[in-house]
Amino acid sequence: MLVNDIENNAGMRVRQIADSAIVASGKPLFVPDFAGHFSARLGLAVRIDRLGKHIDARFAHRYFQQVTVCCVVSGSDWADADVNPETDARALSFDGSLLMGNFQPYDGKSDLSLTLSIDGEPKQDWRWNNAAGKLQQAISNVSRYFTLKMGDLLICDSEGEQAELHIGGKLTAAINGNESLTIRLR
């Protein structure tokens, strides 16, 4: 499940992503041919550890223990004129549209710093102050509408600057300086 605009609860957008969209760190991303250009932007992934519905924000810290950096891939210049890149699942949930790093424990106290580089060149830096509070609020907001189950992934999207992807490139992303995601683009 991808959550956009979590810092503005009134404008929060939620969309579900297919399991086949996930590419694990170390695996290659085969850049699709159905759009002219593809780009990636940083996100933070949280793995849900227990079943819950209508979770109050003050209890949401009990529902996750691990986080990782991820990248949300999107395309532009669609070959199919009827594809709306903002709402169509073909544009948002295609195979390979979510690049996932390796999960690491999160103490719930520290701020998070996420970085994205392509071919060693820094492309995006996202500093998240009060990360625990924002994650807890996102879990609370989403659980009002969806039952969260063990193993579900909640992706908080940076909606920041996008980095252009190109075949032959290497994408790396780190969380708090620890490289967590490495993907070769083919």
Describe the residue ranges of each PLM region.
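Extended, compositionally biased flexible segments
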Residues: 1-71, 75-82, 183-184
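Catalytic-pocket segment enriched in acidic/His residues
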Residues: 12-13, 74-186
